Amino acid sequence: MRECISIHIGQAGIQVGNACWELYCLEHGIQADGQMPGDKTIGGGDAEFDEGEDGDEGDEY
């Protein structure tokens, strides 16, 4: 199980934080009690992350 802690300061921070958590729950299928249904793994589970483009295309910074 993964854990995530977020700290929001002030009224605007709390409102933005609530909106973000609502979006995260909708996108990832998280229920109101914080649990993810076992049969609704979205995006391949914990092992899959999008880290941008793969490979070296000769980009230099």
Swiss-Prot record:
Group of enzyme by EC: hydrolase
Q: What is its main location?
A: cytoplasm
Feature type site, description Involved in polymerization: 61
Entry-annotated residues carrying N6-acetyllysine: 40
What reaction does this enzyme carry out catalytically? GTP + H2O = GDP + phosphate + H(+)
Cellular component GO terms, alphabetical: cytoplasm; microtubule
Source domain of life: Eukaryota
Residues covered by region (Disordered): 35-61
Q: Which UniProt keywords apply?
A: Acetylation, Cytoplasm, Cytoskeleton, GTP-binding, Hydrolase, Microtubule, Nucleotide-binding
Gene Ontology molecular function: GTP binding; hydrolase activity
Cite the binding residues for GTP: 11
Q: Please state the Enzyme Commission number of this protein.
A: 3.6.5.-
The cofactor named in the record is: Mg(2+)
For this chain, the Swiss-Prot or TrEMBL PTM comment says:
Undergoes a tyrosination/detyrosination cycle, the cyclic removal and re-addition of a C-terminal tyrosine residue by the enzymes tubulin tyrosine carboxypeptidase (TTCP) and tubulin tyrosine ligase (TTL), respectively.
| Compartments where found | Cytoplasm, Cytoskeleton
Q: Which InterPro entries match?
A: Tubulin/FtsZ_GTPase_sf (IPR036525)
Instruction: Describe, as the record does, how this protein assembles with itself and its partners.
Output: Dimer of alpha and beta chains. A typical microtubule is a hollow water-filled tube with an outer diameter of 25 nm and an inner diameter of 15 nM. Alpha-beta heterodimers associate head-to-tail to form protofilaments running lengthwise along the microtubule wall with the beta-tubulin subunit facing the microtubule plus end conferring a structural polarity. Microtubules usually have 13 protofilaments but different protofilament numbers can be found in some organisms and specialized cells.
Per its record, how is this protein called by name? Answer: Tubulin alpha-4 chain
Q: Which organism is it from?
A: Zea mays
